[in-house]
């Protein structure tokens, strides 16, 4: 007897979430037409049980969908960044997957660093050849005016994270984020359930949209539990110049230390642990600390850091899908997509 095909089987084949596949098959929620069609074709191909759309695809289910191929001479995908992206950055595994996906479509990626002068003067990197560029993907581009300049190029454009968008006109581009709210709130809930009452945030909430969302998730959570004392001991120095020193000086002035900190990312968390150690506080014995990103360092830092894991492979696949469908269908409505994250409990929160 043949093995029954499940929604999870289809999700595994396409490397999509089970929820996305379920939406396509049950015709619920909002999905890009190309994604919905791809899922339904795969379902028919794999012999999934009868459903409303099956007759539409049975005739050509055996045929592989023709991949979209970029025109010759305009096959470069330009990656723009303001920072050197180390192997510790979540983008490392994401870009591996992204490159793999676009290579299947006979495209290549070029990397261009935006210099401080180019950022200030709103100029493209001198190394970028617009005539050969089919689309742009941006990392660490958090200057709103520069982002608007890129939008004005009228090229297919994807921001992986973005400038803070609160009270600003939307960018005319697709945006991809990791899910920033749910697991921050789960981390706060975990702390409260373990008896922590004064919970604070560390990190510059205005650095980027993801940091802003993480801060707002933290704030909503402590207000939900009626534990707002920690709001007065949030450590949020702005700017990137000598950040560890600024963070140390900020917490050194606190008259009362929090029971726990939720941090904007792992590197803020590690700087915070070091600053607390210099001030005579032990993590987790005196104060708990939670990071975000689940970087390579998080698992071998002392103490091993509780963090929120970003699925780089899924982000890479999603980024390729967003940018290539934008190139293929420029008139699509602009999309904002979030990919799942997961709380990983370790020693820095007593686990």
Walk through the language-model features, giving the residues of each.
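Hydrophobic alpha-helical segments within soluble ligand-binding/sensing domains
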Residues: 174-202, 241-249, 269, 310-328
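Flexible loop/hinge segments that line or gate small-molecule binding clefts
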Residues: 139-183, 267, 293-305
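Short, solvent-exposed amphipathic alpha-helices that sit
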Residues: 89-105, 183-186, 209-229, 271, ...
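Flexible loop/turn connectors
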Residues: 248-351
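Amphipathic helical "hinge" segments at domain boundaries
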Residues: 2, 48-124
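Short beta-strand elements in bilobed, periplasmic/extracellular small-molecule ligand-binding domains
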Residues: 102-115, 201, 219-244
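N-terminal helix-turn-helix DNA-binding module of bacterial transcription factors
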Residues: 1-65
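An alpha-beta-alpha
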Residues: 185-227, 335-350
